[in-house]
Amino acid sequence: MSDDKRAKPEKSKYPVNLLDTPFPMRGDLPKREPQWVKQWQDKQLYKKIRAARHGAKKFVLHDGPPYANGDIHIGHAVNKVLKDMIIKARGLTGLDAVYVPGWDCHGMPIEIQIEKQFGKGLPVQEVQSKARAYATEQIARQRKDFERLGVLGDWENPYLTMNFSNEADELRALGKIMERGYVFRGLKPVNWCFDCGSALAEAEVEYKDKVDLSIDVGFPFAETDKIAHAFHVPLAQLEGKPGWIVIWTTTPWTIPSNQALNMHPEVEYALVDTPRGFLILAKDRVEEQLKTYALEGTIVATARGDALTEVRFHHPLAKMDAGYVRTSPVYLGDYVTTDTGTGIVHSAPAYGVEDFQSCKAHGMPDSDIISPVMGDGVYASTLPLFGGLSIWDANPKIVEVLRESGNLFNSHKYEHSYMHCWRHKTPIIYRATSQWFAGMDVDPVDNGPTLRETALAGIEATEFYPAWGKQRLHNMIANRPDWTLSRQRQWGVPMAFFVHKETGALHPRTPELLEEVAKLVEKHGIEAWQTLDPKDLLGDEAAQYEKNRDTLDVWFDSGTTHWTVIRGSHRDELYDPAADLPDGRLADLYLEGSDQHRGWFHSSLLTASMLYGKPPYKALLTHGFTVDGEGRKMSKSVGNTVSPQDISNKMGAEIIRLWVASTDYSGELSISDEILKRVVEGYRRIRNTLRFLLANLTDYDHAKHALPASEWLEIDRYAVALTDRLQKEVLSHYQAYEFHPVVAKLQTFCSEDLGGFYLDVLKDRLYTTAADSKARRGAQNALYHITQAMLHWMAPFLTFTAEEAWQIFAHGTEHKDTIFTSTYYAIPSVDDGDTLLQKWHEIRTVRAEVTRQLEAVRVEGDIGSSLQAEVTIAAGGPVLAALQSLEDDLRFVLLTSAAKVTPAPEGGDLLVTVTPSQHAKCERCWHYRADVGHNPEHPTICGRCDSNLFGAGEHRSHA
């Protein structure tokens, strides 16, 4: 270890062993980290690690791909650093911990960028070409930032969902799930964004407050006789006055599409006589609603909802235009509530999931469903009264027309939580369109369990970190609708079907044709579908079929990467045949933010359940979102965002890594300037400890100077036993993917166990005993083992610093290039370790009390440093025995010039007496001793220093 070390030039007549190290006190991280990243790239560090682990058991953390658009933000940094720490921690156990980074490349955000740059209306092929080029540029930018964070991985060969092979294999996955009977086409209300012009996945929907017009609308009685019968009142009583069943809604724009009314079968409904006419309302809502309508009223009769089933009412706009002359029947629904509104729900099956299900359950054919809202949010021109208006602009006009009709009972502004597109931040609607779905509850062709059943069983077989994620994902799968696979976009993997022009049926050879298209895509990308002439595959049948123009949901892109990447493009690196065993999984771990329970975790579970009948992962790990120091969500408008690039340039990426590691990622991760300042202070403590260790190992060569543990001094054996105990805790935390306890314990170890005790005691022996004495070499043995262990503990999160120190520490050894080809250090066993841990715990407790008493005397001005003092300790029991066993070495433990132990009176407490020393100070060791000047040739040093410099050297037994 001494090849590139240097000792400070000694000027003193009585030198001490003060050594230097190339490991600087200041990390200078912003300047030096980029140099290290370049070195790692130049020497292909990741490949060296893979070569070192060749043949070892694999550990696969499959990367959830970030989207290839824009610079990385602090959330990206958290995610990538967490993954990197886990990969490195697992790799240091000897596993072949592979990391292939990936990117999600298709989809709407990139299409939007192409529109912004080049305008709308480009040919599809040109959009795809420009989108591919744009994504490539974005990936290069993001990759540079990820590598800057010290993240090691196969950056030269990442997976991209837009790679031709991945696009082709995605089509093959679609073919497989079709063959197994999960895919169908149908008319259903789906989340629809007018700005996207496309259906949205559940994961693409967010909720924000929105102010809408809330209206109470009356549907006039159409079958008065049936109403009289249901409420058991004479028909004549109802015939003299008008009557309405009243609904409440916050979506006036759906009224033109009303086709039914929903009532709860078991709720009591009231027939209320008012000056305006008869009203039907839920009995529990009568008082509240009449106040709202400014009406007095009397309940004439009541009836349960099921008594009114199939009774019909006139459409409220029938008087205003003949196009609305129709009636709406009452259908029963358990989902109707009486918490708010009237207890009656108006049903527009084209624009509500429950509305649609209710109408379909009552036999309404798809062709009868009224759906006037077009994909851009504008009513079809053929819609009476409101054609050509956007639905949002139509709302106030609809209210006005209802008022004119005499059927409006109330309208007011109403704030509520409403669905928005996560990209455009604009309101979305449910809209019935013809789409391709993966059925959650359809029977697969093998008559096995449904997709929902398979996925729920898979959740039970998955580990969750933290544990609450299990119930969250379970609830989402248990309650989700069918998965809308199709999108009406251009930059996406095509649903490459041939559809019969007249019947709409798929070509009978669809699985075979999908494989043919996949082969073309493998060579030319998804662009091949655009240029494909159906005749090339269908021959004479081409005239009867047309190409489907839908693309696959981008969540299907990333959700099938276990198929397209682990089994496909990166099979050699990632695939383990054991994954195909009944309990096998393709990945050990998926790790993402908590939003991915409804995103990537979710889509990956569904696709794997359809393809293999089990999850793709053994475990799911979830981290929280970043917030500022006050717990507020990061927002550009608030101005509280924190840029990882800025932190790296000002403080160093190591500080980001340490912040991530020191934060409990299972909750929100707070970050601010003040928090980062504390992280920097913690980093300096660790770095200073490392510097001390490395400096005092400068002249140590383990091959020459190693000693068996039995020949070390007692305090050295204690320190190594303490290190061994901590290592067991550290490795246990790493196994459970816990980092913040490791950081906390490492910092405590550095500041209290080492800096506050062991190294403090050790300085005298390291500096003053003979350089090659057993006392000093024994101390260096302990320091060597502690440093080995410590560097491995910190390497997963303090990667730059651990590697920097390792280059100095491991110079000339087998793993000199990188700490990451080695494994966690096997700390030598200390036979009496448990006994020493207990004994020295008691000694340290006494030392803390002595230090407190010394400080009190120092504050009084009676002493300067603790070496100016002599102490007498009165103690009893095991404490007395422990202190007495140290003999004269006790003074070195207490950092005093003399220490004496006496038995305490029976039952007496520990008593510490501090006395200023009356002796002279040794120029060399600074102890105040009676024998200073005993050798006239060296009148300024003590007998111990005289012996260490010119004689046989002092004897140490314990410390």
UniProtKB/Swiss-Prot annotation:
EC number: 6.1.1.5
UniProt cofactor note: Binds 1 zinc ion per subunit.
Binding site for Zn(2+): 922, 925, 942, 945
List of residues binding ATP: 636
Keyword Zinc: yes
Keywords: Aminoacyl-tRNA synthetase, ATP-binding, Cytoplasm, Ligase, Metal-binding, Nucleotide-binding, Protein biosynthesis, Zinc
Function description: Catalyzes the attachment of isoleucine to tRNA(Ile). As IleRS can inadvertently accommodate and process structurally similar amino acids such as valine, to avoid such errors it has two additional distinct tRNA(Ile)-dependent editing activities. One activity is designated as 'pretransfer' editing and involves the hydrolysis of activated Val-AMP. The other activity is designated 'posttransfer' editing and involves deacylation of mischarged Val-tRNA(Ile).
Protein name: Isoleucine--tRNA ligase
